[in-house]
Every structure is written in structure tokens, then in C-alpha cells.
Amino acid sequence: MSAFSLSDLERIVAKRAAASPDESWTAKLVAAGQERAAKKLGEEAVEAVIAAIAQDRDGLKNEAADLLYHLLVVLKIADIPLSDVFAELERRTGQTGLAEKAARPTP
């Protein structure tokens, strides 16, 4: 098994985002802006859901990879480092799911 991590992918996304949009899909997506990147993230999420419902293991694996990649692109555009997401996950693990949800502000 590879030691590849989400942090590795975050570094790859950052490097590719700095490239020319003519040479990099990531740079092209970043140049298109957050709305386009977020729509692409949503498309990938729907495709992952469809694969999960269909019990398509290979499809779900592939769509999950696409989903993680596009999430990191959206985070890059928003200037939110993965370490901030990890910190939030760590904070939440100190509570039960019900307690964490109850502590959230209501919209």
C-alpha cells in the first residue's frame, strides 16, 4: 500500500494550480473560479452517490478519488489549508456526533 496522503494531494493541487491553464486542468479550474470548481465538486459528489447506491465498488472508488481531488481544489481557491479541515475534524472527535450537532449554531 502506498503512503500517499491527502496532504500529498494538497501539495500536488497547489503546484498544478500555479501552472498555466493551457497546461493543467487544475490551473484551468482554478482560473475559472470558485463557482465553476464548486459545481464540479457537486457533480463528482452526485456521481459518487450514484455509484454507492448502485453498489459499484470500482465506480465508487474512482468517484471518491475525483471527489477528494475537487474538494482540495475548492479549498485551494478558498485559501483554506487542509490542516484547518483536519483541525476541525480533530475538534469534533472529542464529542459525540449528537453533542457536536447540538453545539452548532442554527441557521
Curated annotation (Swiss-Prot):
Pathway this chain belongs to: Amino-acid biosynthesis; L-histidine biosynthesis; L-histidine from 5-phospho-alpha-D-ribose 1-diphosphate: step 2/9
Pfam families the UniProt entry points to: PRA-PH (PF01503)
SUPFAM superfamilies: all-alpha NTP pyrophosphatases (SSF101386)
Subcellular location: Cytoplasm
InterPro entries in the record: HisE, PRib-ATP_PPHydrolase-like
GO terms of biological process kind: L-histidine biosynthetic process
Keyword entries, A-Z: Amino-acid biosynthesis, ATP-binding, Cytoplasm, Histidine biosynthesis, Hydrolase, Nucleotide-binding
Catalytic activity: 1-(5-phospho-beta-D-ribosyl)-ATP + H2O = 1-(5-phospho-beta-D-ribosyl)-5'-AMP + diphosphate + H(+)
EC numbers, comma separated: 3.6.1.31
GO cellular component: cytoplasm
Main location: cytoplasm
GO MF term list: ATP binding; phosphoribosyl-ATP diphosphatase activity
Family membership noted in the UniProt record: Belongs to the PRA-PH family.
Protein name: Phosphoribosyl-ATP pyrophosphatase
Annotated organism of origin: Agrobacterium fabrum (strain C58 / ATCC 33970) (Agrobacterium tumefaciens (strain C58))
Gene: hisE
